[in-house]
Structure formats: C-alpha cells, structure tokens
C-alpha cells in the first residue's frame, strides 16, 4: 500500500486520537442530556473505552519516537515546533479528560464542576486535532501543505467519533437521539469523497525534479475506492436501523466502528505514502 505502511504507529495515533475527540464530544453531549445520575454514571463507565483507545494511540506514538525519553525531549520547543505543540496538546487533553473521567467514575465529581470540566476537555480535544494538522503543514512537502490535510483530519473526527459515542450511549441504555450525529457523519462522508476527488486531481500538478506526486502511490485510486466502501458499510451499520426507526444494536455499531476505522486507516496510510519534499526547509 505505497510507502505509508512504515508510518503505522502514526496512523494508529492520529486516527484513534481523532476518533476519541469526536466520541468525547458526542458522548459528552449525551452526558449533559442525561435525565438522572444513574444514566450519567453508566455513560461515564462506558467512556472508559475512550481513554483506553487514547492510551493505545499514545503507546503507538511512543513507538514511532523510539522511546519515552524522546517523547519528553520533543517537548523542548513548545510554541516553536509543531511536533512539540502536538504532543503537549495531546498530553494535556489526555490528562485533563482522563482525570475528569476518573473523578466522575468514582462519584466524587460535583455536577456543576463536572460540566465545566467536561466542556474544557472537549475544547482541548479540538485544539489537539488542530495541533495535529499543524505538524504536517510543511511548506517543503507540497502534498501535505494544503487545506486537504486539515479537512481530512477533522473529517475523521466526524466520521469515526459519533459512531463510537453511539455505541457507548447504546450500551449504557440511555435514551438519546443520535440521528442528528448520524446525519453529520453522512455529510462528512460526502465531504470526504469530495476531498478524495479534488486531492487526486491536484496530484498531477505537484512534482519535483525527481518525483511526481501521482506516482508515489500507484494504487491511490483503487485504495480510495476501498476506503469509501468501508466507510459506507460502516455508516450503514448505524443508519439502516435508524431508517427503519429501530435502535441500533451495540454489536452493529461496533462492527460499523471497525469498518470506519479501517477505512480511515487506509486513507491515513495513503496520506503518509504521499510524502515528498521540494526545496529545502530552513529552521527558524
């Protein structure tokens, strides 16, 4: 699948991180809408899986860096380095959101403080995804230095996060209308298809003296088709019951999540496979 497979730790880190951010926002809205403490507590217990996935993502990122010490060293240039900003933003999001979950799950969270804390965690998640996109806005890598990168990362949030949250809320047996979020995911899929087409067309005009962007991943078109098929199948696991006015089963939602994550990981592998440099970067 092109040259992007060697960046599999980053594929896992970015996709899972973006999925968790989207799921925290939607499940958090469900938590706000819960009618009693028992419902809220069941939602909080289900949110354990968000922080489990976030932990897996961070373990993958450490594997990419080689050792935990390098992760600490990479924080030396916060404010000046995109990588430092990303790791700092992700660590703060993980710490603040994870601590909210821990205090909430043991039942020690005052409701007013819990609402403010959760809202703050959601905002930190959005900042984390934004910092992720900034890492790849490198002017000497024209295949990444564009709006498609930013769109792709935030579309992953909208594609994978809501269905994970829907599974958590359904497993918690909470009455909550997830249809608006399913519609948002469908709109994100349409936008994703548009990005795929436009970016594919733009590759023909990107080249260096030794490389042509369109030749970096020969199977780009066919793999993107498979990606869209997986995304459609995954969303179908959520949409079909809703169209029939039935509640989706947790197993169906989990299957849909797996299919969507698989599709987004294919897209992210292609993203890393499109890496190419033009000119020289000058450190500031």
Swiss-Prot record:
GO molecular function: dimethyl sulfoxide reductase activity
Residue intervals annotated with topology Cytoplasmic: 31-45, 108-115, 170-180, 244-250
Record field: transmembrane: 10-30, 46-66, 87-107, 116-136, 149-169, 181-201, 223-243, 251-271
Topological domain spans for side Periplasmic: 1-9, 67-86, 137-148, 202-222, 272-284
Record membrane topology: Multi-pass membrane protein
Subcellular location field: Cell inner membrane
UniProt-listed InterPro entries: DmsC
Predominant location: membrane
Keywords associated with the record: Cell inner membrane, Cell membrane, Membrane, Oxidoreductase, Transmembrane, Transmembrane helix
CC terms in the record's Gene Ontology section: dimethyl sulfoxide reductase complex; oxidoreductase complex; plasma membrane
Summary of subunit composition and partner proteins: The complex consists of three subunits: YnfF, the reductase; YnfG, an electron transfer protein, and YnfH, a membrane anchor protein.
Sequence similarity: Belongs to the DmsC family.
Name assigned to this protein: Anaerobic dimethyl sulfoxide reductase chain YnfH
Species the sequence originates in: Escherichia coli (strain K12)
